[in-house]
Amino acid sequence: MTDIKDIQKIIVLDYGSQYNQLIARRIREFGIFSELRSHKVTADEVRAINPIGIVLSGGPSSVYAEDAFDIDKEILDLGIPVLGICYGMQLLTEKLGGKVVPAGQTGNSEYGQSTLHLTENSELFKETPAEQTVLMSHGDAVTEIPEGFQLVGKSSDCPYAAIENVEKKIFGIQFHPEVRHTEYGNAILRNFAFNVCKAKGDWSMDSFIDMEIEKIREQVGNRKVLLGLSGGVDSSVVGVLLQKAIGDQLTCIFVDHGLLRKGEGDQVMEMLGGRFGLNIIRVDASKRFLDLLAGIDDPEKKRKIIGNEFVYVFDDEASKQKGVDFLAQGTLYTDVIESGTETAQTIKSHHNVGGLPEDMQFELIEPLNTLFKDEVRTLGTALGMPDEIVWRQPFPGPGLAIRVMGEITAEKLETVRESDAILREEIAAAGLNRDIWQYFTVNTGVRSVGVMGDGRTYDYTIAIRAITSIDGMTADFARIPWEVLQKISVRIVNEVEHVNRIVYDITSKPPATVEWE
């Protein structure tokens, strides 16, 4: 088994960008373990973590502001290679004796793509061209670099776009290598990891499994864990991972809240209970949930009600068990980011994060909270799970409640349940189920006039949401062939009662989120 202490790590200190985890993700793609850490981490804590490299992320702060996010200066003296990105470059510049000012005073702020001109050879830019496209997003500027640093690159509006201190192995870049808009961003991060930090690149999903099993066993000991199965990929992967770690100490509670997809309850019991032998208790709490949701149309209230009631159902079931101390969840890193961190604004309270009451009776276990969705699928495959589970469509904890706009009724739920089943059937039949990241239907709550046969109708409008993405942090709408969309539309209108109109959501993320609520 791989010992956590033996795994090479590059840590990313969080200074507030919504896309900070992309840095860690890119590094993991190179076969190097990486994770986000608070910018408040101390030098002693960094020594204990023992990383081979440190990245200071971007962020919205200004280093000259009174409430600027700071760094323990001793971290810069540990002899560990450091890469400062955007705000991270400005921070290390200010800490080491350079000067940062509002860009308008001496230069220009930059937002968008720009051309980087390299002025010196550098390990950081090895095998990249002298001129390359990068994404800038800064309002402040470095006007004086610290002693011992040299200029490596500049742009037309940024005189210090890349700097380095070779002796101390400290590098600063004013642009964002983690985003796709930076042409050689991956190469730059790879150079930092391998050329500067001397990474081996020997971390894999098998290593992650070993590490998580060790962490789970250390945290749980001989105590018992409850896992809520939602029917989605995430909780299913957590279940198999936990069983591998602690065996019969795990009890899975499958709460049927009346908000599941068509046939989902029976599929969960058959696949995870039958094929994988998980101990699953099925609880029919549909009336309990739907009664509480009656008359509620605010999406945040719906999420909170479902999150709270879900835990109360667990409390009821846990009271029948003995020695249960932990609640496991399939929280992903995208869930955590969308719910906000100490440096990032909350986008929406997430079903696995923000809906839990403060007096919850369990400690949390969230083994997937550093992974993106595609990494969870890779993990599931590494655990020996079949494609029908691993490639199952993502499903939020609140279920169809957040795919019904406005008040939830049995009639609305049925329109989503049946239309979603048709959508999934036709996407699979067209061979698109591996190409489209996520797809589902939404009852918009809007009624419109239609004609069916010789009669006038006034029924619901169903929206189809289908996206393509790499990691779920950003997404674009899927270009489904028109003939496939037409077939889906015709089937839904003809086979699903109380629906007379279909629309297709062509909004990217951002500005929209994947789910409608």
Swiss-Prot record:
Coiled coil: none annotated. GO terms for cellular component: cytosol. The keyword Ligase applies. GO terms for molecular function: ATP binding; GMP synthase activity. Residues 203-392 form the GMPS ATP-PPase domain. Disulfide bonds: none annotated. This is GMP synthase [glutamine-hydrolyzing].
